[in-house]
């Protein structure tokens, strides 16, 4: 069980969006590397980074900011947004990323994801972003007819390190994680699932530690951390206690 702090990059800055809308971006820190260091100092063990411009462009846009983050923190970093080819994947992993997150390409070209898992075992995650229960692609700008579980099951046995499941309808608006759909996905596949979108308060952290939620690899928090709705020490202490109880 891991709490992943999120750094979403837009135009080189650390921002949060509301409902995935690039026009509704709030800048939380103009220096993403400093934010990465701060999260490490607070005791977080991982970092979740998204290149928002890259997700729309289909290629890396905030590469300099990501490189600065990698230099600033010793924590493992996972990155999504605009990573669409084996060359992109290899390039980023060689630059120090722990794992890449493949989203749009997982819908458009599942075979590439399977090949990437074979070539880079344990270092490829799949990002499934859903709106109204259907998978969205191209930086959430396009909806598909593909169901969440249907897509996830395509990667059973492929060696996907994790599925990052984001409920777009809740992202950045602090209404709480959609536990029903997240746990339904976790029950449907053997791949570890990370919850994203809507984490709002310590209530969600406590919910994470309940027995039925401990099948999850963890959850991602963005705005709730930046707005001070979650106390990092209290949250991490709760999660550590839950881990001990699971041993």
Curated annotation (Swiss-Prot):
Gene3D superfamilies: Aldolase class I (3.20.20.70)
Enzyme class: isomerase
Protein keywords: Amino-acid biosynthesis, Cytoplasm, Histidine biosynthesis, Isomerase
InterPro entries found in the cross-reference section: Aldolase_TIM (IPR013785), His_biosynth (IPR006062), HisA_bact_arch (IPR006063), Isoase_HisA-like (IPR044524), Isoase_HisA-like_bact (IPR023016), RibuloseP-bd_barrel (IPR011060)
Functional pathway: Amino-acid biosynthesis; L-histidine biosynthesis; L-histidine from 5-phospho-alpha-D-ribose 1-diphosphate: step 4/9
Enzyme Commission code: 5.3.1.16
GO molecular function: 1-(5-phosphoribosyl)-5-[(5-phosphoribosylamino)methylideneamino]imidazole-4-carboxamide isomerase activity
UniProt-listed Pfam families: His_biosynth
Residues annotated as the enzyme's active site: 8 (proton acceptor), 129 (proton donor)
CDD domains in alphabetical order: HisA
Reaction equation(s) it catalyzes: 1-(5-phospho-beta-D-ribosyl)-5-[(5-phospho-beta-D-ribosylamino)methylideneamino]imidazole-4-carboxamide = 5-[(5-phospho-1-deoxy-D-ribulos-1-ylimino)methylamino]-1-(5-phospho-beta-D-ribosyl)imidazole-4-carboxamide
Subcellular location: Cytoplasm
GO terms under cellular component: cytoplasm
Biological process terms in GO annotation: L-histidine biosynthetic process; L-tryptophan biosynthetic process
Similarity field: Belongs to the HisA/HisF family.
NCBIfam families found in the cross-reference section: 1-(5-phosphoribosyl)-5-[(5-phosphoribosylamino)methylideneamino]imidazole-4-carboxamide isomerase (TIGR00007)
PANTHER family according to UniProt: 1-(5-PHOSPHORIBOSYL)-5-[(5-PHOSPHORIBOSYLAMINO)METHYLIDENEAMINO] IMIDAZOLE-4-CARBOXAMIDE ISOMERASE
Record protein name field: 1-(5-phosphoribosyl)-5-[(5-phosphoribosylamino)methylideneamino] imidazole-4-carboxamide isomerase
